[in-house]
């Protein structure tokens, strides 16, 4: 199984990460503001930065409050982009401004890294249940690789386009 990095462990991200751990996935987790000892006690590895998460993961998922946080976490100083492994896939599950998503995607593409924009709907109860709706856009091959992972967090997982 691929090692998954998970950045953003708030209201939505924490239960999503928990569902991945329960499904047997190895996670490396980080949140700039929230503590994540509970996830470490379930078997996740804690990281001290976005860059460290990327350096230890093959698939990096972000679930952050808004566009500025996503941009900072992925392409900002000390961000995911600085620690990427060859062949990594970045999946942003936040609901953000499409222009920021395109900017992040272009920066990752320049590093030869696949990017999926995969926002969710369903709110905290569905995040806890693992029954979110996930609508992704991006590279089809990358989507097919991460789809089994996304299916541990959602029951409706579709690729809507590139």
What are these regions (language model features)?
Residues 4, 95-162:
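Rossmann-fold dinucleotide-binding core
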Residues 1-55, 59-62, 88, 93:
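NAD(P)+-binding Rossmann beta1-loop-alpha1 motif at the extreme N-terminus of oxidoreductases
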Residues 17-18, 41, 72-75, 102-105, ...:
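Short amphipathic alpha-helical segments
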Residues 9-12, 20, 27, 64, ...:
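Generic leucine side-chain signal with a strong bias for well-ordered alpha-helical environments
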Residues 37, 70, 125-129:
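A short acidic, helix-capping loop that chelates divalent metal ions and anchors anionic groups
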Residues 50-114:
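Rossmann-fold NAD(P) dinucleotide-binding segment
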Residues 10, 33, 64-67, 98, ...:
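Alpha-helix N-cap/helix-start capping motif
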């Amino acid at each position: 199984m691929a090692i998954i990095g998970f950045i953003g462990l708030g209201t939505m991200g924490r239960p999503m990460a928990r569902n991945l751990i329960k499904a047997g996935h190895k996670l490396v987790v980080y949140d700039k503001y929230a503590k994540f000892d509970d996830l470490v006690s379930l078997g996740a590895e804690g990281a001290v930065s976005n860059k460290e998460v990327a350096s230890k993961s093959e698939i990096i998922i972000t679930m952050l409050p808004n566009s500025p946080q996503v941009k900072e976490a992925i392409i900002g100083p000390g961000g995911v982009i600085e620690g990427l492994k060859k062949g990594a896939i970045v999946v942003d599950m936040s609901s953000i401004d499409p222009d920021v998503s395109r900017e992040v995607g272009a920066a990752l593409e320049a590093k030869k890294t696949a990017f999926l924009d995969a926002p969710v709907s369903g709110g905290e109860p569905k995040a806890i249940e693992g029954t979110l709706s996930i609508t992704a856009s991006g590279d089809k091959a990358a989507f097919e690789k991460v789809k089994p992972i996304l299916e541990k967090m959602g029951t409706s997982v579709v690729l809507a386009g590139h």
